[in-house]
Design a protein with these regions (language model features):
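Contiguous segments within soluble domain cores/interaction surfaces
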Residues: 2-105, 110-117, 121-153
């Protein structure tokens, strides 16, 4: 079994074996909110299950980590593909999964998405998050000092 691809998206779901994406395929997000912030993302993963691996349950795991190795999210599960009637002998099967994950983003950074099958790394992707223009401006402006009240004599 191998990972064919990992896609980041604003929204993703798999229905009847078909992947539906909205805002998919990005590798960079701009956040216009103060950090730390909560960000909902979706991840779609495609696994290719070889003919000789069908009808065997395999453990899988998806991890999202920052560049310091701090884990932001983890999904555990199992993958098992059967052999549909009429399939050509030897043909691999595709299993697609999609996950919606709320991430707590502490600061602008790069993040890694790692897919594991049976505790072995099978695929990897990465994405970055930066502060939007509004957030950069707020950090650069000095804090305004309160004016002293004027007393009329």
């Amino acid at each position: 079994m191998r990972v064919e691809w990992i896609i980041m998206a604003d929204s993703a779901e798999v229905v009847n074996g078909k992947l539906y994406l909205m805002g998919g395929g990005w590798d960079h997000l701009v956040i216009n909110q103060p950090f730390p912030t909560q960000q909902l993302i979706s991840i779609a993963v495609s696994f290719s299950v070889g003919w000789d691996e069908t009808n065997i349950r395999q453990p899988m795991e998806i991890r999202i980590e920052d560049m310091e190795g701090k884990q932001l999210a983890r999904v555990n599960g199992e993958i098992e593909a059967g052999r549909p009637r009429g399939i050509t002998p030897g043909q691999a099967q595709r299993v697609q999964l999609a996950f919606k994950l709320p991430l707590r983003i502490e600061k602008p950074d790069r993040f890694s998405v790692t897919a594991l099958i049976a505790d072995e790394i099978a695929g990897h992707a990465s994405f970055g998050i930066t502060a939007g223009r509004r957030q950069r401006r707020q950090r650069q402006q000095p804090e305004a000092k309160p004016e002293k009240p004027k007393l009329d004599a």
